[in-house]
């Protein structure tokens, strides 16, 4: 039975979908004004894992992840570059998709862009004004009146007096209260024409928070199962989403029996660098495409999932090397089953049960990966057909996490991308020289080549028929 840690209740809860067998999930996506960094990769990988496990568990999942393609940062970057908003955002949407594909991740079922949902946003703002939860200020902006919603703060667990305006919630002259946040931004004379839309409140553009409320409600309904995102979005973004969505639907007072906007809120932990939160403002961030130049995509996914999704991760090349070494151990064991196949495992299989118990405990991937390493230990001890059976189980369980689906030989030889040192071509040249030395009965030279390769982290494996395989140690 799956349990999910729900940020709203601050506890693990048994997962009960609104419609049996079906799951509707929304994840806050990227603001597309620059290339994606490794923090974005964690969001992508974590919720890719969640969707894969839900589907492996038999659920029909509708996975929506939005694209924010109108935002102050986008506008500023477009002005700085002297290009239209659409040219900038399209370029970085393409780059995001390229990064995601390179990481080996699934595409969301729906990937709405904010600018395609302006009408829905305006409709929701209109309802909030009608419900006396929003007002137009003297500067032309339309703001949400936070103190008029008594239940505001339920996600962050803070009272109104404890809350701060937070990131992206600028306190403007027109606000009645510093906690109020903007729903519709009045157009400024210096802003480009492609950043404004007509509305009942004058030309302008949507605020950041209303975008996700409108898109999620339009695509998933006013009440859905799971909403996810990074921990930094819990407040104010997700808090404001709840306020807007429930305020538009129920007004100031949601009754006890009224369905909440979202049943389960999930938040992944931060990426840290030298024990500091990774962020562009600190200049300590790493682009996905740059990390991919040095590390295999599967290594990056493994690095992310060997830590529980709610815990922070300290990023370093050393940590990625450790992840690479772990994958090498798994693939080396898999290679011992010469014809390992992804098979269907029944729930009665003890390995499958242990793995499922871990994953059903709030997607506990570290514990699930520990099960894989326990199988590796058994593979190393097994003989004959039992090796093959265990290798099949290893591959089948790995598939649930998008691991171990490649040819082991190919993976073990392809880590030149992960390490400095000899290229596969150079290694094959040395192997050919060793074969020639053995044929000439110059065994001292053959042994010297083997030793030299081992010193550079290359392990040779002589096989029947005079063939020689290799892997990185």
Curated annotation (Swiss-Prot):
Q: Which cofactor does it need?
A: Zn(2+)
Which parts of the sequence bind Zn(2+)? 28, 212, 237, 241
Q: Which species expresses this protein natively?
A: Polynucleobacter necessarius subsp. necessarius (strain STIR1)
Which Gene Ontology BP annotations are present? cysteinyl-tRNA aminoacylation
- State the encoding gene: cysS
Top-rank taxon, per record: Bacteria
Q: Where is this motif: 'KMSKS' region?
A: 277-281
Q: Which GO terms describe its cellular component?
A: cytosol
Listed PANTHER family: CYSTEINE--TRNA LIGASE, CYTOPLASMIC (PTHR10890:SF3), CYSTEINYL-TRNA SYNTHETASE (PTHR10890)
Specify the protein name.
Answer: Cysteine--tRNA ligase
Q: Where is this motif: 'HIGH' region?
A: 30-40
Xref: InterPro entries: Cys-tRNA-ligase (IPR015803), Cys-tRNA-synt_Ia_DALR (IPR015273), Cys-tRNA/MSH_ligase (IPR024909), Rossmann-like_a/b/a_fold (IPR014729), tRNA-synt_1_cat_dom (IPR032678), tRNAsynth_Ia_anticodon-bd (IPR009080)
* Subunit structure of this chain's protein: Monomer.
User: Any idea which GO molecular function terms this record carries?
Assistant: ATP binding; cysteine-tRNA ligase activity; zinc ion binding
Q: Which reaction is the catalytic activity of this chain?
A: tRNA(Cys) + L-cysteine + ATP = L-cysteinyl-tRNA(Cys) + AMP + diphosphate
- Which residues does the record give as ATP binding sites? 280
Q: What compartments host this protein?
A: Cytoplasm
Q: Which family does it belong to?
A: Belongs to the class-I aminoacyl-tRNA synthetase family.
The top EC class, named as a word, is ligase
For this chain's record, the cofactor binding note is: Binds 1 zinc ion per subunit.
Keywords annotated in UniProt: Aminoacyl-tRNA synthetase, ATP-binding, Cytoplasm, Ligase, Metal-binding, Nucleotide-binding, Protein biosynthesis, Zinc
């Amino acid at each position: 039975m799956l349990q999910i840690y729900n940020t709203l209740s601050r506890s693990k809860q048994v997962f009960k979908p609104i419609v049996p067998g079906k799951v509707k999930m929304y994840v806050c996506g990227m603001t597309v004004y620059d290339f994606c960094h490794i923090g974005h990769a964690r969001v992508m990988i974590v919720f890719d894992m969640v969707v894969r496990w839900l589907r492996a568990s038999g659920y029909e999942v509708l996975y929506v992840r939005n694209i924010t393609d109108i935002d102050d940062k986008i506008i500023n970057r477009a002005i700085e570059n002297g290009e239209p908003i659409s040219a900038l955002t399209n370029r970085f949407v393409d780059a995001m998709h390229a990064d995601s594909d390179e990481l080996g991740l699934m595409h969301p079922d729906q990937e709405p862009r904010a600018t395609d949902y302006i009408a829905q946003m305006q409709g929701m703002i209109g309802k909030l004004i009608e419900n006396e939860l929003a007002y137009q200020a003297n500067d032309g902006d339309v703001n949400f009146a936070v103190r008029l919603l008594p239940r505001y703060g339920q996600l962050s667990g803070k009272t109104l007096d404890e809350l701060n305006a937070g990131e992206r919630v600028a306190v403007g002259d027109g606000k009645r209260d510093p906690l109020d946040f903007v729903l519709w931004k009045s157009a400024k004379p210096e802003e480009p024409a492609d950043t404004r839309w007509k509305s009942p409140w004058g030309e302008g553009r949507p605020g950041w928070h209303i975008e996700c409320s409108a898109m999620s409600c339009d695509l998933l309904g006013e009440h859905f199962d799971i909403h996810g995102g990074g921990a930094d979005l819990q407040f104010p973004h997700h808090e404001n989403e709840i306020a807007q969505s429930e305020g538009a639907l129920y007004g100031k007072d949601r009754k006890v029996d009224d369905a909440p906007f979202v049943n389960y809120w999930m938040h992944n932990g931060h990426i840290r660098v030298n024990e500091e939160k990774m962020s562009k403002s600190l200049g300590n961030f790493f682009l996905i495409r740059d990390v991919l130049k040095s590390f295999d995509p599967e290594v990056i996914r493994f690095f992310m999932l060997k830590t529980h999704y709610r815990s922070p991760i300290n990023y370093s090349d050393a940590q990625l090397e450790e992840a690479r070494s772990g994958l090498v151990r798994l693939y080396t064991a898999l290679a011992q089953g010469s014809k390992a196949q992804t098979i269907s495992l029944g729930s009665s299989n003890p390995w499958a049960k242990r793995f499922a118990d871990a994953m059903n405990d709030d997607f506990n991937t570290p514990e699930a990966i520990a099960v894989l390493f326990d199988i590796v230990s058994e593979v190393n001890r097994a003989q004959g057909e039992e090796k093959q059976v265990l290798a099949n189980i290893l591959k089948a369980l790995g598939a649930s996490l998008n691991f171990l689906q490649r040819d082991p030989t190919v993976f073990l030889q392809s880590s030149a991308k992960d390490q400095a040192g000899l290229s596969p071509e150079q290694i094959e040249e040395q192997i050919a020289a060793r074969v020639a030395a053995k044929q000439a009965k110059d065994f001292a030279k053959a042994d010297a080549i083997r030793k030299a390769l081992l010193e550079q982290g290359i392990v040779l494996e002589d096989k029947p028929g005079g063939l020689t395989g290799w892997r990185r140690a």
